[in-house]
Amino acid sequence: MTDRLVPASLALRDDGTLVSPEFGDLHLGASGALAHRVFVAGNGLPTRWQDRRTFTIVATGFGAGGSFLAAWAAWRDDPARCERLHFVAVEPHPFSRDDLRRAATHIVADTTISADVEALADAWPMLVPGLHRLEFDEGRVVLTLAFGESIDMLGKIVARADAFCLDGLASSSDADLQSTDVVRALSKIAGEHATFAVHASSDALKHALGKSGFTYREVDDLLVGEYAPRWRARRHEPPLALPVATRRAIVIGAGLAGCAVVERLAARGWEVTLIERHDRIASDASGNPAGVFHPLMTRDDNVASRLTRGGFLHAIARWRALENAGHAFARSTNGMIHLAESADDFERMRDAFDAFGPPSDYVSLLDIEAARAHLNLSVAQGGLLFPHGGAVWPAGLCAAQYAAAGERVRLLASTRVAKLERRGDAWHALDDAGGTLAEAPVVVLANAGDAARLAGLQHVALQPVRGQLTLLPPGSTAPLPCPTIGDGYAVPLDDGTLLIGATFEPDDVDPAMRAAGHLENLERVRHLLPGLIGDLPDPDTLRGRVAFRWVVGDRLPLLGPLADEAGAIANARALSGAQARDLPRLPGLYGAFGFGSRGLVWAALGAELIASQLEGEPWPLERELADAVDPARFLIRALRARRVGRAG
């Protein structure tokens, strides 16, 4: 169960200074000049990041963002700066957007910090637990905020830190942040000779640092040092970039998953060959007229809830970035309602809502009367209103991502990959005659059900599910103000057509349209929204579309590096208690498939995860969630159960 997020508030003292009443002055963080002296100069910056591809700073607090703004300004002012600056900050009590703007403006006033406070405030995420990734300066400065309790979140971050900003660790009033557990967590993500700096210090902090492998020294009123343990190497080292001679990749599959990967790799300077078996991108399920887009909510905030929340929020941020860069696409912006299927279902929704305590910009609970008023239609139950949920035209999104990649992507359409073969340091995508279609050190399989065949995976549980949707002509239904889901869905399209659906037919691979499928969709939506459809139309006269979704047994996607199954099976005894990090991997082979009906929610986050893994950057997912979507998870279960050698 995820703890509720308790935001900090901001108040004005009689003397005109700002303070957080609950957490005091220290929650604001260092002011601009102090932040620069402590966290920038104290970590040997800008010299240490110069001429590097990436540099990662991890902060034990964020407050009003003084340390981040100081680092951003120093990076901007340095002509020899690293190509990409990552700043990861844990914050148990974030400010609201308005309070953040006021506090940040307050602490940077009359300093030389030139970073744009408004840009930070404009990008500020919804106040819900988890990781939030924000990009600035065309994606070259990346802020990852970890909202949640410090010890908990530090243990979930996957990164290789080059420098630490120990915000809050010097305060004797903050026993939590002074604990050995926090500093030990920092030691697990510290890169070789990672430095730290803190203004003032306590004996407890010095003891914790020394015990966890950090050396330190006092310089004036600063405590500075580096990670230099005397003991042997750690069992699990922080992630490094994949060593490749050239930054080239092949992406197989040009749907939501593949186009998202293409855009994220191209944004980092990779040259990508995109291979699609159809004559255009977004031709299979990604070619549907629209798809609904929303997170899940459960009382226990389980893995699926946290993963869909992270994917939902990350996708919103990425889509806005695409639109701001001139790559707009069709999507609804007036929210989405998830209606309960029964009274018991509504009580489950209420329990989840009350347990999570979300802000209204994330979700609101609607009783029957409120849902009826919002939709102007009769409803059987209340539900949840997601103001930023809605419907997206998947093909338009794919086209926008493809356009954003620009000249860094080359499309091979109407091309089938018969086989993948590793030759030396490169993968070769081969046609039916054995000829090379493309070669690169990295391949990302984003081709749904065909991915397991190409990778030769035996321990991946994929199942095809037939989905038929129905299109009702303009004027044939009552007006619907926003997409609505429950047992089925109804989506108003721009031309007045109403999209309803969809059937869910496991292991059915018949591509033909069926009148029975239309009738099933009509009956389901009549139950969902009794006043939406009058007399049932003749199903034989209706238009629609059939597409196939590929789902995984646990209903989670497959994202990340693919396992070397043969190598793992050969070493099965030693790996019977393995974690995901212990398994051998096929060099440079990654997967982004098994999205089921949640491609819109998971594709952007999955692409960012894979790009971050390739580049050795901080991951946009917590370790537990990354393990939950690891393509090797079924192999791990088979190894633990000693069932290797047959599909698991």
UniProtKB/Swiss-Prot annotation:
It is found in: Cytoplasm. Gene3D superfamilies: D-Amino Acid Oxidase, subunit A, domain 2, FAD/NAD(P)-binding domain, Vaccinia Virus protein VP39. GO terms for cellular component: cytoplasm. InterPro entries: FAD-dep_OxRdtase, FAD/NAD-bd_sf, MnmC-like_methylTransf, SAM-dependent_MTases_sf, tRNA_MAMT_biosynth_bifunc_MnmC, tRNA_S-uridine_synth_MnmC_C. The keyword Oxidoreductase applies. It holds the Pfam family DAO. It comes from the Bacteria. Its EC number is 2.1.1.61, 1.5.-.-. This is tRNA 5-methylaminomethyl-2-thiouridine biosynthesis bifunctional protein MnmC. The lineage of its organism: Bacteria, Pseudomonadati, Pseudomonadota, Betaproteobacteria, Burkholderiales. The gene is mnmC.
